[in-house]
Amino acid sequence: MTKAIMLQGTGSDVGKTVLVAGLCRLFANRGVRVRPFKPQNMSNNAAVAEDGGEIGRAQWLQSLAARVPSSVHMNPVLLKPQSETGSQIIVQGKVWGHAKGRDYQALKPQLLGAVLESFATMRAGTDLVIVEGAGSPAEINLRQGDIANMGFATRANVPVVLVGDIDRGGVIASLVGTYHILPEEDRRMIRGYIINKFRGDVSLFGTGIEAIGGFTGWPCHGIVPWLKAAGRLPPEDSVVLERLARGSDGALKIAVPVLPRIANFDDFDPLRAEPDVDLVFVRAGERLPADAGLVILPGSKSTIGDLMDLRAQGWDRDITAHVRRGGRVIGICGGYQMLGRMVHDPLGIEGSVTETPGLGLLDVETEMAPEKTVRNSTALSTEYDAPLSGYEIHLGVTRGKDCDRPSTVIDGRPDGARSGDGLIMGTYLHGLFCSDAYRAKLLASFGLSGERMDYRASVETALDEIATELEAVLDPAWLDSLAG
């Protein structure tokens, strides 16, 4: 019989995603057939699953950790926040609808069937499913109709382990407070807890374990230290961008403006990992650095809205000055659309603004259309004759004279555009910097000739290191009970 366990948190960003990924790799290394599952995720960081639809990139990473093909059933409900139109709702990989926050609460019961169907699909033919909750089960104002935490756990009869983040402080109060605020029906689902992100001498927390046990009766399944290897994994949420280093001593400075609805920002992770690259995420209120050699406009869930915000920050003037100095610009997906002369949205897909001027750096125009392109792709860089692999997730069609100079050829068809002087490039392909050969040639064009890392291998190594650390600190009897 397939076993299942669910990790829920005392709050957001307590480390559930990394723990699920680490446990998936731990059990995969033991020969256990394991799969990840997250009933509901909210993120503009999406991936294209191998069966052809959208899921959160966190679940894609967890499938990599489990050494199984990714599937839309690993994340049956994905909410992608937009601008004034609320969130786009993806169900089992496909666009299901749009809703604002209050409206979505009323829609959740309609989605429970799809969630349970996907969970049954994930359980079939496997030994263990590791489920990740969202936010905190203690948000009792959202409990009615819940499909992300205890609402799912009680319906699917999946036991829960609570994760508390000691690094942010107040972990005892968070765990004990969750116990007291939950109704008895939900409390009965919890089988223990894990303390995450611990720094220092674990023995000093002994009285803390006694206190938590005294208040709740829950056993502690382990105290997990701060996992340094987690920093080498692609980040899941844009909130992580606030904590990333604001640059290093790398020879090439690359500037990325952090747009309000930035999407798929893990595109930049391979560049961040290169020691001779100084990757700077530019926040609201900051100027784009004048000494940057390259500016990259990221993907966006709301191209027109983010383009208007980019102008409000004055970044359009910074980018124009950058190009006049001979600087280069790359636009990815929504960032590519922003580089053109105009962005049209006659159907109001993104909102009430039906068109806005682009930055005018490429002689192209984009028209939003309801059909969404979602696919994994192999490609070739026309500029560097380098192989690429990545994925496309976008609305809209881009046309214009500069498309006669495509930046890439994706599955045999031209994609993207380049300016006549070669300074400006746009593409719809996400993940291009993960391709080691392309990244090496791009950096070499800036005079960086150092040996390049194998990015995929570095992620695999990080997952193995996390699995090894978890095996050393988590309760062996608890792990064995899940493996057996």
Curated annotation (Swiss-Prot):
InterPro entries cross-referenced by the UniProt entry: Class_I_gatase-like, CobQ/CobB/MinD/ParA_Nub-bd_dom, CobQ_GATase1, CobQ_N, CobQ_synth, GATase_3, P-loop_NTPase
Family annotation (CDD domains): CobQ_N, GATase1_CobQ
Task: Name its pathway.
Answer: Cofactor biosynthesis; adenosylcobalamin biosynthesis
Coiled-coil stretches, from where to where? none
> What Gene3D superfamilies does its record include?
3.40.50.880, P-loop containing nucleotide triphosphate hydrolases
Kindly state a single biological-process term from the GO annotations of this entry: cobalamin biosynthetic process
Task: Work out whether the entry's keyword set contains Lipid metabolism.
Answer: no
Q: Which domain of life is it from?
A: Bacteria
Q: Which GO molecular function entries does the Swiss-Prot or TrEMBL record give?
A: ABC-type vitamin B12 transporter activity; catalytic activity
Q: Which residues form the active site?
A: C333, H430
Q: Where is the GATase cobBQ-type domain?
A: 251-438
Q: Describe the task this protein carries out.
A: Catalyzes amidations at positions B, D, E, and G on adenosylcobyrinic A,C-diamide. NH(2) groups are provided by glutamine, and one molecule of ATP is hydrogenolyzed for each amidation.
List the protein's name: Cobyric acid synthase
Gene name as annotated = cobQ
